[in-house]
Design a protein with these regions (language model features):
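Residue-level signal for pocket-adjacent positions within structured domains
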Residues: 34, 64-65, 70, 75, ...
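An acidic site on a long C-lobe helix of protein kinase domains
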Residues: 49, 89-92, 216
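N-terminal auxiliary segments of SAM/dcSAM-dependent transferases
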Residues: 1-70
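Short, glycine- and charge-enriched coil/turn segments that flank and shape catalytic ligand pockets
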Residues: 47-51, 103-110, 131, 168-172, ...
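S-adenosylmethionine
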Residues: 132-133, 137-275
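SAM-dependent Rossmann-like transferase core, predominantly class I methyltransferases
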Residues: 55-129, 134-147, 272
Length: 276
């Protein structure tokens, strides 16, 4: 089987043509190590045994996210291990990291990443900001194992701890930066989402009740009001539908200089606020 045959199989299974080609390229390059020239000229079986290829094709035909099939996802120009126990890193979240880096490079801040998942935010900030002291929390043991795999393979200096964002410890004045991409998709938004996200990615990392969309943000903002140093900064990835409520909540919580930033698609995706 060759590249053109494989992407056509996926296209016939229901993928759009562009998506079928992109998924095929990611599988062949990131899992099988094929170059563009290899894809044009070589049989895939030269780089993978027939059984593995058959299993991978079957998984993709069932719309398993290609990142889970490959076991890797790109984030800020690095390959991170991903498995179904963590969310697949999104390009939008890269912009959140870049905002922190813009503000704090090269000042060696103390950083906490709440809800670290794969560890992509924590590892990126630890590697990109010299001298940064980075802690990371998650409540999922499976996510913590994945994050630690990434931290070790990338040689990032990050301390990962099991901690519930809704019941945090009583830290005071410990961090210069707290960053989080918590669950923020309302249950009612499920019907507009891709089926493979709903079927394969962990729902506890995605969804919040319709009647309490700011559940995690309020808890984290309260914790940050105690644990940030004076002038420290809180950064969130947010649901664009809730940006006004987020600004109001942070203002009411005593934060200053509350700023919204759009993502690459023009949606109000990020917010930062400064502890007075």
């Amino acid at each position: 089987m060759r590249y053109n045959e494989l992407w056509r199989i996926l296209h016939d299974s229901g993928y759009a043509e562009g998506e079928a080609k992109a998924v095929t390229r990611m599988l062949l390059t990131d899992k099988y190590g094929m170059t563009t020239a290899d894809m044009l000229c070589e049989e895939i079986e030269k780089y993978s045994d027939a059984h593995t290829l058959s299993e991978d094709v079957s998984a993709l035909k069932a719309f398993t996210p290609v990142q889970y099939v490959v076991g890797k996802a790109w984030f800020c120009d690095r390959l991170f291990t991903v498995r179904p126990g963590c969310l697949i890193p999104r390009p939008e979240t890269e912009e959140l990291c870049r905002w922190v880096e813009e503000d704090y490079y090269p000042s060696a801040p103390a950083i906490l990443d709440i809800g670290t998942g794969s560890g992509c935010i924590a590892a990126t900030l630890a590697l990109d900001i010299p001298g940064a002291k980075v802690d990371a929390w998650d409540i999922s043991d499976e996510a913590i194992a994945i994050a630690n795999d990434n931290i070790h393979s990338l040689m990032a200096d990050v301390n990962v701890t099991r901690c519930d964002a809704l019941n945090p410890p009583a830290d005071v004045g410990k961090y210069d930066v707290i960053v989080s991409n918590p669950p923020y998709i309302c249950d009612s938004e499920r019907r507009g989402m891709e089926a493979n996200v709903l079927e394969y990615e962990p729902p506890t990392a995605l969804f919040v009740p319709d009647d309490d969309a700011l559940l995690f943000y309020r808890a984290i903002a309260h914790y940050a009001s105690l644990s940030l140093t004076p002038g420290g900064t809180l950064y969130f990835e947010i649901n664009p539908l809730c940006h006004s409520e987020m600004c109001s909540m942070l203002d009411a919580s005593g934060y200053v200089d509350v700023l919204i930033r759009n993502d690459q698609f023009g949606k109000k995706r990020f917010i930062k606020a400064t502890k007075r």
